[in-house]
């Protein structure tokens, strides 16, 4: 049931429902009762992931083609990879949670109205208020009708109700951070020597190089290789809280030998 007088939700036993996420309400994330004791508490905590990769390393490619007549092309590429490591995306947790509905800030699109489960209609009306009975509460048939109405209003919702009183780390924000990154690429062209003789140049090579040109990863954050700094533990690994991604660089140049 729901009591609008104190804005609290109650279970079938008449007791207020509270979880480690704070006061419960329809549409909230449901946590698994690992111990089976009928209550979700600190005893239900489990290991959510591993920041250490199962396999990591790198490999390179080198390619040369051409001759003295038309010049020589060269290409080198260096790749790095990691498989099996996981990252806690605290940025997604922070920007995907609303701690005070009157203080929305920098929230992600998946918790926008129409995408998140909400107790409010599009016109701003509070749905439970439409089903308050003569006893001043939403209960019995009124509660069932409210649940049905909420199901209609939230038919297209793709994420749970993000309004929460507390933060709880769940596997929703633990992501696979495996990746394949093109760490470095160089493409060069060495001009034929016969073209350079008149300029008294022995060899001339034009090149382009770049670093961190692309990264293939299922991770939804800015970069799976995060550098973490937290107030609690500055040495923590595998935690992304608005960490800067690796920079990308481009270079053009020419090598001359006289």
List PLM regions with ranges:
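Outer/extracellular conduits and scaffolds centered on Gram-negative outer-membrane beta-barrels
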Residues: 1-258
């Amino acid at each position: 049931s729901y009591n609008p007088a104190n804005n609290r939700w109650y279970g079938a036993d008449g007791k207020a429902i509270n979880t480690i996420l704070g006061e419960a309400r329809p549409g909230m994330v449901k946590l698994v009762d690992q111990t089976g004791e009928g209550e979700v508490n600190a005893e239900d905590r489990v290991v959510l992931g591993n920041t250490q990769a199962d396999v990591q390393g790198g490999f390179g490619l080198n390619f040369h083609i051409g001759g003295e007549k038309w010049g020589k092309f060269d290409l080198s590429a260096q790749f790095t990879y990691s498989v099996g490591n996981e990252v806690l995306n605290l940025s997604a947790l922070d920007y995907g949670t609303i701690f005070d509905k009157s203080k929305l800030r920098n929230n992600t699109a998946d918790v926008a109205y129409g995408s998140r489960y909400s107790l409010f209609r599009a016109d701003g009306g509070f749905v439970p208020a439409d089903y308050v009975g003569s006893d001043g509460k939403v209960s019995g048939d009124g509660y069932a009708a409210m649940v049905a109405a909420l199901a209609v209003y939230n038919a297209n919702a793709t994420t749970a109700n993000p309004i929460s009183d507390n933060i709880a780390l769940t596997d929703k924000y633990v992501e696979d951070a495996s990746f394949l990154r093109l760490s470095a690429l160089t493409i060069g062209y060495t001009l034929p020597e016969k073209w350079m003789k008149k300029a008294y140049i022995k060899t001339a090579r034009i090149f382009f190089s770049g670093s961190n040109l692309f990264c293939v990863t299922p991770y939804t954050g800015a970069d799976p290789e995060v550098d973490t700094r937290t107030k609690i533990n500055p040495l923590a690994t595998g935690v992304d809280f608005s960490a800067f991604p690796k920079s990308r660089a481009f270079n053009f140049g020419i090598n001359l030998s006289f």
